[in-house]
Amino acid sequence: MEIVINNISGLNNSFNNNNNSNNNDENEINFNLIKESIVNFKLWDINNKQIEYVCRLGSGSLCRVYKGRLNGKPVAIKVFSPIRFEEFKTEFLMMQSLRSSPFLISFYGVSIVEEPQKQCYCIITEFCSRDSLYHIMTDRLIEIGWNRFFQFSMQIILGLQSLHNRKPKPIVHRDVTSLNILVNEDWECKISNFSASRFNCLNTEYINSNNQNKSFAFCSPESSDFQDIDDDYTSLSSSITSKSDIYSFGIIMFELISRIINGEYSHPFSEFKDIKNDFQLLLSSKNGLRPSLPNICPEPLEKLYKQCVDQSPLNRPSCEEVIISLNQIRSFYLLPQTKKSWDNLVLKNKCK
């Protein structure tokens, strides 16, 4: 039985002590000005009275996430504090510009909610009941075989293709991780979390160097081509392109293949015990280190994985090329002798 909480401050009155300490006059924003300044905001503005907050699902450095209902329909609600206005604005501008795709999280609208002594911004999207791909892979009770691998991989790359082929400006996600791939009741993968995304990404971009939301294991080598500007920001190299997303997709391939063959989840780069922090991880990646697939990994999958995580972005395949390769590998897998051989790799883990 679901318990509806009409006042979300009753769940958690603040994001954290740091947010409270920063909740000063300069962070108090006139919300009427916000609605006027953000393109298309009014078209997507949802009256908060239409939204019911059911339960809190989790929280991160950027926002809190709730399960809720919009006019009786299950939804996910991301609540950003005032100091996270830029992240909210970026994600809204990205999501309202996306064309419809079955493998991108559906965007329903935005809302403004009042909490004690502050107002917060909300993004409302479809609710995915199976949580993230990461949570599915870490649950040993869920069986994942090669059919699921091809299903998940194809859905993710099709979602990326719809971003990279967007007209007139393509979108580079820049934070493709298994945590940002949500899975609905029908086992369909949905790319989510567009707060780090950018149009084109051909010019220099700026990111917060203290952003704890970034998953460094999925960062391409060119992502570490930065130089300090000041204490708060770094300048990213213009080399971050759609091929950086392909690298991240390759790391998700590693996660899935390792989970299938080993029977349990392996964090990317966890095999390298000398890597103690994110800086070492980024430096190691830049120097060519990659997570190692199990030595019994089928050769066609290993080849595609290595192409996706190639040191040079120019050598990585496009989404279209990955789709062709996945279809070819799946056809090869479905050959009776191949299927028997590959499926035996999974059966060995069940006997462990």
Swiss-Prot record:
Residues 51-333 form the Protein kinase domain. GO terms for molecular function: ATP binding; non-membrane spanning protein tyrosine kinase activity; protein kinase activity. ATP binds at L57, G58, S59, G60, S61, L62, C63, R64, V65, K78. Its EC number is 2.7.10.2. Keywords: ATP-binding, Kinase, Nucleotide-binding, Transferase, Tyrosine-protein kinase. GO terms for cellular component: cytoplasm. Coiled coil: none annotated. The keyword ATP-binding applies. GO terms for biological process: signal transduction. It catalyses: L-tyrosyl-[protein] + ATP = O-phospho-L-tyrosyl-[protein] + ADP + H(+). The active site is at D175 (proton acceptor). It comes from the Eukaryota. PANTHER family: MITOGEN-ACTIVATED PROTEIN KINASE KINASE KINASE 20 (PTHR44329:SF288), SERINE/THREONINE-PROTEIN KINASE TNNI3K-RELATED (PTHR44329). Belongs to the protein kinase superfamily. TKL Tyr protein kinase family. This is Probable tyrosine-protein kinase DDB_G0290471. It comes from Dictyostelium discoideum.
